[in-house]
C-alpha cells in the first residue's frame, strides 16, 4: 500500500483486526514492483491508478470487489475564504460547461488521449499565481511525463486558473 493514502488507512484496519501484515511504500509504483517480484500478495490502491498499472502490465489484474469509495477535493488555507469561494465558483462553471468531464475522459475510459485540455487563447492572468502542491506519483491524477507534471489534477487546476485569471505554478 502507498504510505499515507486512504488505502493505507483501510489496510491498517485489516492489519489491526485480522493480523494481516501490511507493507508500506512511498509510491504506488514501488508497491506494484514488489507485487511483480513476488514480495507481496496484493496492492491496495485507487481504481484509476490500478487501471493504469494493469494496462502496462499484462500479468496484473484488478479484483471485482471494491474495498471502498471516496471523493477528492482541493485544499485551500482556511483563512482564505475569498479564494475558496472563487475556486468553488470556477469548478461549478467548469462542471456545467463540460470541461471537467472532458478532462477526466482524456485520461480515463474509451476516449483517453482524445480530449487534451488546452487553455483558451488570450487569458488575462493578471490576478497573480496559484501554486499547486502534489507528489505526482498517482497516475492518472498526477504523474510525470517528459519531466512535466501532468494528469487530471494539473489539468483541472489549470482550467480553474484559466477561469480565474491566474498563472498556475
Predicted regions and their residues:
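Short helix-initiation/N-cap motifs at beta->coil->alpha
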Residues: 22-37, 70, 154, 169
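A ligand-binding cleft/hinge motif common to bilobed small-molecule-binding domains
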Residues: 9-13, 29, 34-68
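Short loop->beta-strand "edge-of-pocket" segments that line small-molecule binding or catalytic clefts
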Residues: 1-6, 20, 129-134
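Surface-exposed patches in mature extracellular/periplasmic domains of secreted proteins
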Residues: 22, 64-65, 101-106, 168-169
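Extracytoplasmic small-molecule ligand-binding "clamshell" domains
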Residues: 24, 86, 125-169
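Helix-loop-beta element that forms the nucleotide-linked donor phosphate-binding surface
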Residues: 14-18
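Extended ligand-binding regions for polar small-molecule ligands
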Residues: 3-6, 51, 73-113, 154-158, ...
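Periplasmic-binding protein-like
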Residues: 47, 51-89, 111, 115-119, ...
Amino acid at each position: 500500500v502507498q504510505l499515507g493514502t486512504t488505502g493505507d488507512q483501510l489496510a491498517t484496519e485489516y492489519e489491526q483486526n485480522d493480523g494481516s501484515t501490511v507493507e508500506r511504500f512511498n509510491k504506488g509504483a514501488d508497491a506494484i514492483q514488489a507485487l511483480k517480484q513476488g514480495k507481496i500478495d496484493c496492492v491496495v490502491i485507487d481504481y484509476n491508478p490500478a487501471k493504469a498499472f494493469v494496462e502496462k502490465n499484462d500479468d496484473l489484474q484488478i479484483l471485482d470487489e471494491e474495498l471502498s469509495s471516496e471523493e477528492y477535493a482541493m485544499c485551500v488555507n482556511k483563512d482564505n475564504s475569498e479564494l475558496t469561494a472563487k475556486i468553488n465558483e470556477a469548478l461549478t462553471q467548469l462542471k456545467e460547461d463540460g470541461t471537467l468531464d472532458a478532462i477526466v475522459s482524456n485520461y480515463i475510459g474509451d476516449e483517453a488521449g482524445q480530449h487534451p485540455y488546452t487553455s483558451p487563447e488570450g487569458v488575462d492572468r493578471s490576478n497573480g499565481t496559484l501554486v499547486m502542491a502534489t507528489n505526482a506519483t498517482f497516475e492518472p491524477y498526477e504523474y510525470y511525463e517528459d519531466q512535466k507534471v501532468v494528469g487530471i489534477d494539473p489539468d483541472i487546476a489549470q482550467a480553474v486558473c484559466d477561469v480565474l485569471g491566474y498563472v498556475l505554478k
